[in-house]
Curated annotation (Swiss-Prot):
Quaternary organization: Homodimer.
One Pfam family, short name: Glycos_transf_3
Job description of the protein: Catalyzes the transfer of the phosphoribosyl group of 5-phosphorylribose-1-pyrophosphate (PRPP) to anthranilate to yield N-(5'-phosphoribosyl)-anthranilate (PRA).
Residues reported in the UniProt entry to bind 5-phospho-alpha-D-ribose 1-diphosphate: 82, 85-86, 90, 92-95, 110-118, 122
Cofactor note: Binds 2 magnesium ions per monomer.
Protein name according to UniProt: Anthranilate phosphoribosyltransferase
Domain of life the protein comes from: Archaea
EC code(s) of this entry: 2.4.2.18
Taxonomic source organism: Methanosphaera stadtmanae (strain ATCC 43021 / DSM 3091 / JCM 11832 / MCB-3)
Catalytic reaction equation(s): N-(5-phospho-beta-D-ribosyl)anthranilate + diphosphate = 5-phospho-alpha-D-ribose 1-diphosphate + anthranilate
Pathway as given in its UniProt record: Amino-acid biosynthesis; L-tryptophan biosynthesis; L-tryptophan from chorismate: step 2/5
Positions bound to anthranilate 1: G82, N113
Length: 349
């Protein structure tokens, strides 16, 4: 299919149908095309601008080629992740938020790889904490059932795209795979909290997510204190643009820390630390409710906002503000800290 459509994409800016995009991904993972053709296809799509149908078709094929995890949630199974590629580097916010929210009953399938834009990614952090990130499908299901959380290490499950990943690294520029990774989780997620590096793409990814079976979700991009695009997650230093998904409807609006019952923080208080050891200490401080400095409080607030969003999307609370109150309680009574211990235990069974 790639050989049939490549000229039209380049010469005519032609958009692909869902089926054509699906077949193109089949071609990409087949290994039958020279690297230069694959590079040309990915670059041509990037220059044209990837459409909802194209991202949908590519993702469906990518998920079909992945190692399957046959987990059928009774209510909501949420994926929490971001694209990376943002400009403002924070600590492992989604990782900590997932630990807290799973302690509150949210079932979470966290799908990811090692660091993309951060200095120390979610997979790196979980591994350093003692979590086994290389789980088989059976162990993923067991971990979700036992402690509401499992990490799905992308390279194990998306083996078919290995050759394409090598080409991506050689290109050293964004491709459609920066968007496919966070939305191609092999579990049957029906809820989603996903950070995107470009605020202009939120509605596009929200529509793709609905095409993939997501019933409720928040596709987000956080801004800095000056209103500049900054981070692929909810922000507590500025406003956050959100595409809310609610059973077939999409609503795009801006939210602020005040919607969570919190105040704005200073950028310097949430910026990523320099070393892995500092990242891990931040996680421990949050789970132990350390609030000594302004940095401690700002980092805690950021995690509370993200945890609150997960709890809200999975219907464990009725509002974002209630989600913050519940998340704070889970930390203060030790539930979140015990949850990390459970995640470590069941991931290593």
């Amino acid at each position: 299919m790639i050989s049939e459509v490549l000229d039209d994409i380049i010469d005519k800016n032609r958009n692909l149908t869902v089926d054509e995009a699906y077949e193109c991904m089949d071609d990409l993972v087949s290994g039958n095309y020279p690297n230069v053709v694959v590079s040309s296809f990915l670059t041509a799509l990037r220059m044209k601008g990837e459409t909802i149908d194209e991202i949908t078709g590519l993702t469906r094929s990518m998920k079909n080629h992945a190692v399957q995890i046959d987990y059928k949630p009774e209510d909501y199974l949420i994926e929490t992740c971001g694209t990376g590629g943002d400009t403002f580097k924070t600590f492992n916010v989604s990782t900590v938020a997932s630990i807290i929210a799973s302690a509150g009953g949210a079932k979470i399938s966290k799908h990811g790889n090692r660091s993309v834009s951060s200095k120390f990614g979610g997979a790196d952090a979980l591994e350093a904490l003692g979590v086994n990130i290389e789980l088989s499908p059976e162990k993923v299901i067991n971990s979700i059932d036992k402690c509401n959380f499992a990490f799905i290490f992308a390279p194990i499950y998306h083996v078919a795209t290995k050759n394409v990943m090598m080409i991506r690294k050689q290109l050293k520029t964004r491709t459609v795979f920066n968007l496919l990774g966070p939305i191609s989780c092999p579990t049957n997620v029906n809820a989603r909290l996903t950070g995107i590096y470009d605020p202009e793409l939120l509605e596009t990814i929200a529509k793709v997510a609905m095409n993939l079976g997501v019933e409720c979700g928040m596709i987000v991009h956080g801004f800095d204190e000056n209103g500049n695009p900054a981070m692929d997650e909810i922000s507590n230093i500025g406003k956050t643009k959100v595409a809310f998904i609610d059973n077939g409807d999409i609503t795009v609006k801006y939210i602020t820390p005040e919607d969570f019952g919190l105040s704005f923080s200073k950028p310097e208080d949430i910026v990523a630390p320099e070393t892995p050891q500092e990242h891990i200490q931040i996680i421990y401080n949050i789970l132990n409710n350390v609030t000594t400095t302004s940095q401690d409080r700002a980092r805690l607030d950021l995690c509370l906002m993200n945890s609150a969003s997960i709890l809200y999307l999975t219907k464990k609370v009725d509002s974002l503000e209630e989600g913050v109150i519940y998340s704070r309680k889970l930390i203060e009574d030790g539930s979140a800290k015990k949850q990390l211990e459970k995640i470590i235990k069941y991931s290593n069974e």
